[in-house]
Structure formats: structure tokens, C-alpha cells
């Protein structure tokens, strides 16, 4: 026994300071272990106290357990049947306490006085429309007084966002905000650009028309007039025509430069000139339309006249009178060709 006691004293469980375990750590439950008391003295003795096995006393028997029906125990079946069969008519104020005004419209119960009863059992009528009774209309009555604050938020309409339109808004004070001023400036710039583009197009069209007119004027100035430009060439052609007429008539007569032929050429000259002068006015319009072709004809006519004038021969001296008179007529005839 003394050796066991020594072992118990040296064990870490028995010594509070020895061993690696802290005394704060909870130890295992020793309810099932053997309980002993040691008396120290001259003769130390170990006294066994308590039972060998730790056994708890069973709980006392309860009156109400889970196998019993509480409704029968307390007698609540009768009250349950009454609660099921009874129809409660609770007032409106019992579950809607925050609504202002008189909530209970009718204190005494009246049949067909609720809106539900009218919906479930509508009044039977014929084709005619019968008005509801005042008792039935009581279900549709609105209570006087303002709407409570807790329900006002549901009926508040959200503020509509103002869309910025590109229109000039006139203010009474004449003061425009920054956003409106920027909108006005942008709109003004757009209109100015559109007007500027239209103005440019108009100016371009005017310039094109002016250029066309100037080109036409230059062409008219460069081309010589029919009466003035044909005189030098016409004179040469007239002389050549006179030479040609004299030589041809002289050859037909059989002698160069005879007196009868010269008088014949002189008599033919004024008549041809008169006829050609009357015809020249109608031909001037055609000459203006065919200016480039006339210039080519004039150059070729002048060349022909110069050739004929130089190579006339003896016929030119014999037909002098006819050549003088037929100069203008020859020029007009050559202009036609």
C-alpha cells in the first residue's frame, strides 16, 4: 500500500506542480473510478468511500408524457368544435389600425352590406339597370380625410426628364443658362454653315455664267464682221471675177478684150450687184452661225483671188469695166461657197 501511495504522489495527476500538464486543463471525469480517502498519521490508512460503480438514481415517474393526448387531458375538444363552427365577423379596425377616420361603417350586422357579398351574390334583375340600395352603396363609400403619409409615396408620380429640344426659348428676363447658350450657339453655327454653303453655290453658279458669257464675247470679237472682214478679200475676188468674166466672154467672142464684150460685162455688173445686195442681208444671219467655216472659206477665197489676179493675162485689161462693177457680187458669191 505504501508503494502505491508513493506512486500516486509521484504521478503527474496527483502533483499540482510536477509533470507537463497544466492544472488549468480540465481533467477527465472520475465519476466511475473508485473513491478512497487516505488518513495520514502514525499509521496511515486508506478508507473506501462510495459505491464501487457510480450509478445515478432514475427520474421520478411523470404524469404527462408524450404518449398522452393533450386535447383529451385538458378537455379542449369541445372548444375546438365551437371554434370551427363559429363564423367570426371582425371589425376593419382590428387589423387596420393605422387608417384614419371611422373604419367600422355599420355597427350592427346587415346582410348583403359588404362588397364581397355583392360580388358573390349579385342582385337579380331583368334587362333594365336597377340602382343599388344605399346599404349596398355603403361598401363603395370613400372616407373623408387626407391620405396617410405611409400611402402617399405610392401615388407620387416620378418627375419627367425634360428633353432638350433644339429650339430657341425666349426668356422674359433675357438671361439664358449655360446649357441653353451652348445649344443656341451650336444651332446658330449649323444654320450659318448651311447658309454659307448655299451662298457659295449661288456665287459659283454666277461665276460659271459669267465665264460662259465672256467666252462667247471673245469668240464674237475674234471672228471678223461679214461686211468689214470680207472687203479686202472681196475686192480681190471681185477683180478676179471681172477678169474671169472678161476672159471667158472674150474667148467666146473670138478676140481678147473686144469692145462688145467689155460693154456686155459692164452691163452685167450693176445688175448682179443689185441682186446680191438684196440677198446679202438674209445671208448675214447664216454667216454669224457659221463663223469658223467662213474663216476657212475666206482664207481659201483670198488665196484663189490672189492666184487669179496674178494670172489673169490679157483678159484682165479688156474686162476692166466689168471687173469694177462685179467686185462686190463676186465677193458675196464666194462667201456663199
From Swiss-Prot:
GO process annotations (BP): positive regulation of transcription by RNA polymerase II; regulation of transcription by RNA polymerase II
Coiled-coil ranges (or none): 189-223
GO cellular component entries: mediator complex
Pfam families, per the entry: Med19
Principal location listed in the UniProt entry: nucleus
Residue ranges with Low complexity bias: 297-309
Compartment(s): Nucleus
Regions of compositional bias (Basic residues) in chain numbering: 159-171, 208-221
InterPro entries, per database record: Mediator_Med19_met
Biased composition (Polar residues): 28-38
GO MF annotation, one: transcription coregulator activity
Compositionally biased residues, Gly residues: 310-330
PANTHER family recorded: LUNG CANCER METASTASIS-RELATED LCMR1 PROTEIN, MEDIATOR OF RNA POLYMERASE II TRANSCRIPTION SUBUNIT 19
Subunit structure: Component of the Mediator complex.
Family: Belongs to the Mediator complex subunit 19 family.
Known function: Component of the Mediator complex, a coactivator involved in the regulated transcription of nearly all RNA polymerase II-dependent genes. Mediator functions as a bridge to convey information from gene-specific regulatory proteins to the basal RNA polymerase II transcription machinery. Mediator is recruited to promoters by direct interactions with regulatory proteins and serves as a scaffold for the assembly of a functional preinitiation complex with RNA polymerase II and the general transcription factors.
Name of the protein in its database record: Mediator of RNA polymerase II transcription subunit 19
Origin species: Drosophila melanogaster
Classification of source organism: Eukaryota, Metazoa, Ecdysozoa, Arthropoda, Hexapoda
Amino acid at each position: 500500500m505504501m508503494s502505491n501511495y508513493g506512486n500516486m504522489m509521484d504521478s503527474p495527476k496527483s502533483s499540482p506542480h510536477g509533470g507537463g500538464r497544466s492544472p488549468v486543463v480540465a481533467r477527465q471525469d472520475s465519476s466511475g473510478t473508485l473513491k478512497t480517502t487516505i488518513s495520514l498519521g502514525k499509521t496511515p490508512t486508506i478508507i473506501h468511500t462510495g459505491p464501487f460503480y457510480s450509478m445515478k438514481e432514475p427520474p421520478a415517474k411523470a404524469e404527462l408524457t408524450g404518449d398522452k393526448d393533450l386535447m383529451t387531458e385538458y378537455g379542449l375538444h369541445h372548444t375546438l368544435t365551437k371554434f370551427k363552427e363559429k363564423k367570426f365577423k371582425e371589425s376593419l379596425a382590428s387589423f387596420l389600425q393605422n387608417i384614419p377616420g371611422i373604419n367600422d361603417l355599420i355597427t350592427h350586422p346587415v346582410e348583403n352590406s359588404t362588397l364581397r357579398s355583392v360580388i358573390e351574390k349579385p342582385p337579380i334583375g331583368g334587362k333594365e339597370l336597377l340602382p343599388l340600395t344605399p346599404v349596398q352603396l355603403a361598401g363603395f363609400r370613400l372616407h373623408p380625410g387626407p391620405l396617410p403619409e405611409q400611402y402617399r409615396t405610392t401615388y407620387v408620380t416620378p418627375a419627367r426628364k425634360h428633353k432638350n429640344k433644339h429650339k430657341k426659348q425666349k426668356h422674359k428676363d433675357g438671361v439664358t443658362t449655360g446649357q441653353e447658350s451652348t445649344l443656341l450657339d451650336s444651332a446658330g453655327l449649323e444654320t450659318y454653315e448651311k447658309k454659307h454653303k448655299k451662298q457659295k453655290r449661288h456665287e459659283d453658279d454666277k461665276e460659271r455664267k459669267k465665264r460662259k458669257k465672256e467666252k462667247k464675247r471673245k469668240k464674237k470679237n475674234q471672228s471678223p464682221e461679214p461686211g468689214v472682214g470680207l472687203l479686202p478679200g472681196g475686192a480681190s475676188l471681185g477683180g478676179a471675177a471681172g477678169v474671169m468674166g472678161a476672159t471667158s466672154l472674150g474667148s467666146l467672142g473670138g478676140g481678147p478684150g473686144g469692145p462688145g464684150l467689155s460693154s456686155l460685162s459692164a452691163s452685167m455688173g450693176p445688175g448682179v450687184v443689185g441682186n446680191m445686195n438684196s440677198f446679202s442681208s438674209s445671208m448675214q444671219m447664216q454667216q454669224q452661225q457659221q463663223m469658223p467655216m467662213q474663216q476657212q472659206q475666206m482664207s481659201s477665197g483670198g488665196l484663189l483671188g490672189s492666184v487669179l489676179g496674178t494670172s489673169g493675162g490679157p483678159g484682165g485689161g479688156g474686162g476692166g469695166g466689168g471687173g469694177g462693177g462685179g467686185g462686190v457680187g463676186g465677193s458675196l458669191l464666194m462667201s456663199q461657197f
